[in-house]
A protein has these predicted regions:
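AAA+ P-loop NTPase catalytic core and its hallmark functional loops
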Residues: 2-188
Length: 188
């Protein structure tokens, strides 16, 4: 088995996530793997152990900061809105986004890393040019990027360091965030 330096949140806290999902009786927003209350419990921990299959599970606190901020993030995402975490370096923005993604979508690795060289095809989609030449524009020739994957699967897409990307890349996200539609004009 291959080990990584820092396994994704959904791997590190697999047992906690599984227990919370299986004991969660709250209403889940569309495409959420657990209710907003269970997401809050996963991130902020629980003073009381969770009983599951005859065992007690302690849900540890993972985010040590402003609890109200976590709650506002959860409410924003439950309202099907985009969420942008802005702050000084080292203030746990990435960690909080990973925790939210793992709890809500079951995956925290659907991520775009923003740089000055980020292009639209790195965030939306690109093409397998051999297939494109052989078969023309088709779903088979399309190579999905994180934003496409997120929209197709109904999972969160994390965008790290968005302010480092060119303005036109940031502008191209506005329509996707407001309309919740990613157009692929080549497919008609």
């Amino acid at each position: 088995m291959q080990e990584s330096i820092k396994p994704p949140v959904e791997v590190r806290y697999k047992e906690e996530l599984q227990v919370l999902r299986n004991t969660d009786t709250g209403r889940r927003p569309e495409n959420w793997r657990m209710s907003p209350m269970a997401v809050r419990t996963f991130i902020l921990g629980s003073a009381q152990p969770v009983q599951y299959e005859g065992k007690e599970y302690h849900i540890e606190k993972k985010y040590f900061g402003n609890n109200a901020l976590v709650e506002r993030c959860i409410v924003t995402l439950a309202g099907n809105r985009g969420l942008m975490l802005v702050g000084e370096p080292g203030t746990a923005k990435t960690m909080l986004s990973e925790l939210l993604s793992a709890a809500i979508s079951g995956v925290s690795t659907n991520t775009i890393q923003g740089t000055a060289g980020t292009t639209e095809d790195m965030i939306k989609y690109s093409w397998n040019y051999a297939l494109l030449l052989a078969k023309g524009p088709s779903r088979e020739a399309l190579v999905p990027a994180p934003l496409y994957v997120g929209m197709e699967k109904g999972i969160l897409t994390r965008f790290e360091e968005i302010t480092r990307t060119p303005a036109e890349i940031q502008d191209s996200l506005i329509s996707v965030l407001s309309d919740k539609v990613l157009n692929v004009p080549e497919l008609g």
